[in-house]
């Protein structure tokens, strides 16, 4: 019975880094920039709400599933002088501003949030985060930002779903009644630089954290800092067609470095399709639609790159989004 208890303990310990970085497991990680790096919070001049669902190893009895909801947007004060200008492109007014006026007009604050929930029927990982960033134009075409956030991570075992020979064992009864649980509160920071054709950012997660558990075995702190670098570029192949590669690299001392990459073709602001890769883990394809100016939908399918049986080889992911614009403005995304 002690062996069973040790296995359960090891599952919680192994789940901790996953809970801290569960957003990276999404194939469409670019849908949640504020979860990757706090500095990307409010990178767009509009508000967006996303909801997604990911099913891993479809067909397996204890297949993990992941759900998330997020929001991201920016606060900025529009120049009221635009209201008196009757032109088809209101942004044209900015062309006549001095550099100082331009920076003042386009500096803005970003606010974002993310909540993710992962379960396989026996254990649960959930995480919530709230992020803030300040964006300041460096030139007419390049801006920089700095951000910070706080994340709450919670991992626990649903002990009632396990079956053992001796149900009267005191360890099993304790797990059933109290659950084995681990909680963490972390501080995340990041910086970024971006323009209409590129973005690049660096962030640290778990810079500091508070920790609480339901068992003395977890009270010994094991602190570490995770580092993340992400970058993207878009190349205009024609006025209507763009090539958009992007990459995400994550590293901490507890796990091997992870590399997540994708490349997409985007047709106007209507349709995109591409391929993705996670080093030594999986590869797949993605497709997305922009239904009008506000509603978006993305789908991804992944195939495991390592040897596995067919029942564990189907990973599906769906993301729905809704964008809110200021009246009279339509802008392209800075993050892909």
Regions found by a protein language model. Give the residues of each.
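Sec/Tat signal peptide C-region and signal peptidase I cleavage site
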Residues: 16-20
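Subset of outer-membrane beta-barrel
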Residues: 21-336
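Hydrophobic alpha-helical membrane context
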Residues: 14-15, 49
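Sec-dependent N-terminal signal peptides
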Residues: 4-14
């Amino acid at each position: 019975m002690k062996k069973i208890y040790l296995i359960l303990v090891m599952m919680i310990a192994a789940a901790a880094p996953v809970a801290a970085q569960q957003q990276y497991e999404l194939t469409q990680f670019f849908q949640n920039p504020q979860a990757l790096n706090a500095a990307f919070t409010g990178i767009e001049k509009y508000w967006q709400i996303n909801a997604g669902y990911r099913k891993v190893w479809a067909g397996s009895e204890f297949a993990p599933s992941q759900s998330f909801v997020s929001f991201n947007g920016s606060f900025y004060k529009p120049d009221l002088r635009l209201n008196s200008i009757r032109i088809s492109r209101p942004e044209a007014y900015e062309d006549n501003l001095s550099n100082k006026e331009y920076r003042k007009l386009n500096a803005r604050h970003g606010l974002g949030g993310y909540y993710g929930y992962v379960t396989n029927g026996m254990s649960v990982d959930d995480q919530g985060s709230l992020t803030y960033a300040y964006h300041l134009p460096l030139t007419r075409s390049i801006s920089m930002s700095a951000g910070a956030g706080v994340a709450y991570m919670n991992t626990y075992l649903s002990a009632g779903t396990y079956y053992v020979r001796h149900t009267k064992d005191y360890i099993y009864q304790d797990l059933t009644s109290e659950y084995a649980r681990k909680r963490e509160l972390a501080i995340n920071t990041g910086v970024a630089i971006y323009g209409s054709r590129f973005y690049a950012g660096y962030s640290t997660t778990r810079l500091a954290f508070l920790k609480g558990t339901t068992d003395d075995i977890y009270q010994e702190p094991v602190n570490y800092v995770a580092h993340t670098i992400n970058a993207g570029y878009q190349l205009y192949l024609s006025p209507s067609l763009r090539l958009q590669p992007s990459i995400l690299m994550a590293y901490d001392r507890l796990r091997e470095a992870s590399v997540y990459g994708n490349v997409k073709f985007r047709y106007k602001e209507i349709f995109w399709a591409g391929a993705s890769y996670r080093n030594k883990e999986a590869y797949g394809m993605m497709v997305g639609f922009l239904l009008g100016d506000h509603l978006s939908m993305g789908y991804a399918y992944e195939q495991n790159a390592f040897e596995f049986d067919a029942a564990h080889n189907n990973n599906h992911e769906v993301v729905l989004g809704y964008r809110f614009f200021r009246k009279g403005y339509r802008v392209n995304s800075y993050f892909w």
